[in-house]
């Protein structure tokens, strides 16, 4: 068993090898599921490849205690730009809670069982699953833990995924459909991607090959993408006791609307999920139903920056780090710079489409639907602030300066 425990000391002790350096915390790449786009439009494409970011590192099999009663394990994930997801194990007298139990599917489940064994636990020891937000690398194992260990599922109250069958009758047992109905699950995903983008045009969606793999995996895409149904939904400010600590729920919309962080005010520990990562920035999607997801993200980041006496931040990808305030402020500054790039481009694009502005913000190799989505989120933020006007021409959104 490879389990590294902290030495004797206070609740704020931790292994220094687990903490990101300031240099790592000052670099940026864009974290987004199924896409990892670089931001700068004028970066030299011939430059030598950079060392992979810490979030891109392959999953380690080692289990490390990062704070008393909190173990960090890593599960491999097969998403471009990401090498692992941190699955935290929170120990207490009842057994353990796990945070973000990896991707759906047998491979990830096997790795989760292995990491629990390395920590000295089995699946039946899991009494609670915390899912920080509605992306598959975070909720994948939740339903299986619920079924096999009777584990409670904790999310923010707004938790919802694209795999939800939104037009199901309220009286239907959606949990059973999640587990047993590949047809319903695939139909929900196909409906989601069949909708036109809010800035015009058809969405690419998953390839037929991807959909076929999902149908074949485990015999059912329904079981692979079983959507967690929270048994303990939290609201902002609510407390929950895990790992002998009282955690405060913090609703942190931005990366997703349903994103949840947990804060231990007594010992200054923050589980940040994908909201604040040590060296890459989370994707802010223009597909979100909210009018201005970037503004929500800014507000959530400011809340992170205001948390007093943080001793350690525990992200979903990459290494734990100390300067949560500085990192949150740096991410805000980064997006403000992206907004300035758009402002500077407006005179040259007085009636620009989302695709036109995307080409200014992103490198050519990153052009595509995901880059357009984040560009749209930034344009809508400027429109909500009264700096741009949007109109549609033949179904395509165009942006012009006010006045």
What are the functions of these language-model segments?
Residues 3, 13, 107-110, 115-241, ...:
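Active-site HxH/HxHxD metal-binding segment of metal-dependent hydrolases
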Residues 28-52, 56-57, 340-403:
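C-terminal regulatory/interaction regions
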Residues 150-156, 271-273, 331, 367:
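Short hydrophobic/aromatic-enriched beta-strand-loop microsegments
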Residues 130-138, 156, 253-255, 259, ...:
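Histidine-centered divalent metal-coordination motifs
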Residues 60-121, 125, 168, 261-278:
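Conserved beta-strand hairpin/beta-sheet module of binuclear metal-dependent hydrolase folds
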